Amino acid sequence: MPLSSHSERLMGTTITISLADERADSLLQKSFDLLKELEYRFNANSQKSELMEINHQAGIAPVKVHPDLFELISLGLEHSLAPSSHLNISIGPLIQTWRIGFSDAKVAQPQEIESVLPLINPHSIELDSSVSTVFLKHKGMKIDLGCLAKGYSADKVAQFLREEGVTSALINLGGNILTIGKNQSRDNQPWQIGIQDPANPRGNHLMTIPVVNQSVVTSGIYERHLTVDGKDYHHIFDSQTGYPVETELASLTIISDKSVDGEIWTTRLFGERPASILWQVESLEGIEAILIDKEGHLSCSSGIPTL
């Protein structure tokens, strides 16, 4: 059966869903309706989003939130508090200071960075699961779920499509890929997912991997960056220093069953040395990694050849 596809610009990127089903038009419409609902819930750049209500009430009062938002913040907080984690959902003030990826991006001044660093503390996020409330203890704190929201949303769409009986689909949220089943438009073969060459324009791949019922999430310093006076500043920040993380990597790809896990581990591990990343990935069940350094060298975890 041929694939039916639909694309829209949401969550700051182009989202495309392709699926093989006689009800494709209706299922695609419902999938994008779900994505729009989730964007409204999680968007850190919309003054009207549910997440922004939490940020507006920082230092004032707890905010009761939708179960999806509470679940995602809880998950993000758990991984923000993990030892040596580079993921930090309280990084919002820093993201808003630099604005990399937006039209008003700028190099933050040292005094600006110094003023927001004390606010970037996940220990100051209070959750009450009995009433689904979130409270930011200090005025000026901001949660940013940009490192998790696309993966979580992809998983929600996949859950919906599976419940509807869809057996062949590809969900592409700006390069974050999640597959359902095999590609029915290609003789039911595994989906072939390209790994972007960081040194060349989008669509140039260093390798291609076969994927069935898995997610492929890539984080790279080439994705969004700002160049000022010949110096590049990328969008992956070190919440300890307030500056873009110093790294040997150009990109890190995580292959996992759930897309949100790919988002978690690309963020948690980006900033570690390549050898350390591979060592940690080998201890994680159901997680594989592909690393590309700034020199273009590629290294993979042990499960990649058998995928």
Please provide the spans of the model-predicted regions.
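Mature catalytic core of soluble alpha/beta enzymes
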Residues: M1-L307
